[in-house]
């Protein structure tokens, strides 16, 4: 037909069999990619340290989505939570990946069958014998089936009635595991961080959708509405489908970037706002203060802080710190975290306790400044030593460690104090292995950042696609023009293929 690359989809217009074929092939590609990507991630994933080397530090993209649905165990005998497992069966990471690949193969064969056997009786109007699709009826069927799935997911999978539940954790991402979730039917169900809302909203949306599906199967649209919305044109379906997809993409951008019950920090990493607001820092300090109030010594109080919680309070885990053009997982940046060194507390020779001012998210470099409890600058690492008044050496700063690997150690020499002051600027202090992965020391973003960036871009592109195809279908008669030689009343947009022979035309005299 000599079509340019951007017009090739013309071949499936008015060809229901091949329209089904290309959709089957598309679903085959999606399922095949999901299964193959999962197997690739499982091949490169290191499950040995779920606390300091979790999946989001390793750049896993598919695995977090599997885990939040309750797939956490591997045929290799390990679990994402760090436990040993035996015989996880089909409901395992490898099992789900392989079922997607098998599904992909079956869809591939179905696509070929429908491409070859495209001219089925099913696709012909029994009154006219012409190829035709009853699009409002098809809409009702799709709505009913998808709503049944939606209802089933909320009522059975998430609640644990017939399924594993979903990933549930505390507000600080320390105790997460897969649990059955009871639906939340009150105002608390609208809290985006409440897993109960996932169950209740899927049940509610599924119920409404089932009723709407039955309605669209039993009630025909009025003729004026049918014509006004071009319900007989397949491009109307394309336009409205694109709108549903871009709207969903925008919503998931928000739930991913700002965080929600469906994007737990144990699986996708912390959000940038948790660093900006000092979310984990405040919780750690609160726990330490409570422990000291109960009679614990500072070193004991800090030793009670889980490494997992301390690791969240580190700027390298902030998804906004990685540049969009720095490819690779977080571990390729600052390295593989090996140990929490502890919490450094600095003191000047006057006995004042000092803390290092933390680096804001959008700074690559930031002055190392030590302030007292009143926020007054008492020490720094100067840019120009000749003019310094508050240098570590001049002020006589020492560093004492509480908790972690260096618990109880005190550093008096200026080089060591400076080293730990620079590290404290980035949050809690950790030891990293940068040799194994040849990490370059430049921060990378987490899968949370990549997901948001990708979906925001695609949502924007699909938004314009919706406008384009919506305009084409609504204004088809305007764009096409009404030719004087057409002697038959036709629905514009119904015959758009090159070489169309079905519209009666009067030859030029």
From Swiss-Prot:
UniProt membrane topology term: Multi-pass membrane protein
InterPro entries associated with the record: PS_antenna-like (IPR000932), PS_II_antenna-like_sf (IPR036001), PSII_PsbB (IPR017486)
Annotated GO biological process: photosynthetic electron transport in photosystem II
Domain of life: Eukaryota
HAMAP family: PSII_PsbB_CP47 (MF_01495)
Family assignment from sequence similarity: Belongs to the PsbB/PsbC family. PsbB subfamily.
Identification of the protein by name: Photosystem II CP47 reaction center protein
Gene, per the UniProt record: psbB
């Amino acid at each position: 037909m000599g079509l340019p690359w951007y017009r090739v989809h013309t071949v499936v217009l008015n060809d229901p069999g091949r329209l089904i074929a290309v959709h089957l092939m598309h679903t085959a590609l999606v399922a095949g990619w999901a299964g193959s990507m999962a197997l690739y991630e499982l091949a490169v994933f290191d499950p040995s340290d779920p606390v300091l080397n979790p999946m989001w530090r390793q750049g896993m993209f598919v695995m977090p989505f599997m885990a939040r649905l309750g797939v956490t165990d591997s045929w290799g005998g390990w679990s994402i939570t760090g436990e040993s497992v035996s015989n996880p069966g089909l409901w395992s990471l490898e099992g789900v990946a392989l079922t997607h690949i098998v599904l992909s193969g079956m869809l591939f064969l179905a696509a070929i069958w429908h491409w070859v056997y495209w001219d089925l009786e099913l696709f012909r109007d029994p009154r006219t014998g012409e190829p035709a699709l009853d699009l409002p009826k098809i809409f009702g069927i799709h709505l009913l089936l998808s709503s049944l799935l939606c209802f089933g997911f909320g009522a059975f999978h998430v609640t644990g009635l017939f399924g594993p539940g979903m990933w549930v954790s505390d507000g600080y991402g320390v105790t997460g595991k897969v649990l059955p979730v009871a639906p939340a039917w009150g105002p608390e169900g609208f809290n985006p961080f409440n897993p109960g809302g996932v169950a209740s909203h899927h049940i509610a949306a599924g119920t409404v959708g089932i009723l709407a599906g039955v309605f669209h199967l039993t009630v025909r649209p009025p003729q004026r509405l049918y014509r006004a919305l071009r319900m007989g044109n397949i491009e109307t379906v394309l336009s409205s489908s694109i709108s549903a997809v871009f709207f969903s993409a925008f919503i998931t951008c928000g739930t991913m970037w700002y965080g929600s019950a469906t994007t737990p920090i144990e699986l996708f990493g912390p959000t940038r706002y948790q660093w900006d607001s000092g979310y984990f820092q405040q919780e750690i300090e609160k726990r330490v203060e409570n422990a000291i109030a109960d009679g614990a010594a500072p070193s004991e109080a800090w030793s009670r802080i889980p490494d997992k919680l301390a690791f969240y309070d580190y700027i390298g885990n902030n998804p906004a710190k990685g540049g969009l053009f720095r490819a690779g997982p977080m571990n390729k940046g600052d390295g593989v975290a090996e140990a929490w060194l502890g919490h450094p507390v600095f003191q000047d020779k006057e006995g004042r306790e000092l803390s290092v001012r933390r680096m804001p998210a959008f700074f690559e470099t930031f002055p190392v400044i030590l302030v007292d409890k009143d926020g007054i600058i008492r020490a720094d690492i100067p840019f120009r030593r000749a003019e310094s008044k508050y240098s570590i050496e001049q002020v006589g700063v020492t560093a004492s460690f509480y908790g972690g690997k260096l618990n109880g150690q005190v550093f008096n020499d200026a080089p060591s104090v400076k080293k730990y002051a620079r590290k404290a600027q980035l949050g809690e202090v950790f030891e990293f292995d940068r040799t194994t992965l040849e990490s370059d020391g430049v921060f990378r973003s987490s899968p949370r950042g990549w997901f948001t960036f990708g979906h925001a871009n695609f949502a924007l592109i699909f938004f314009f696609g919706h406008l384009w195809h919506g305009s084409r279908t609504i204004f088809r008669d305007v764009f096409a023009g009404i030719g004087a030689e057409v002697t038959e009343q036709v629905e514009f947009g119904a015959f758009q293929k090159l070489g169309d022979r079905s519209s009666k035309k009067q030859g030029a005299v």
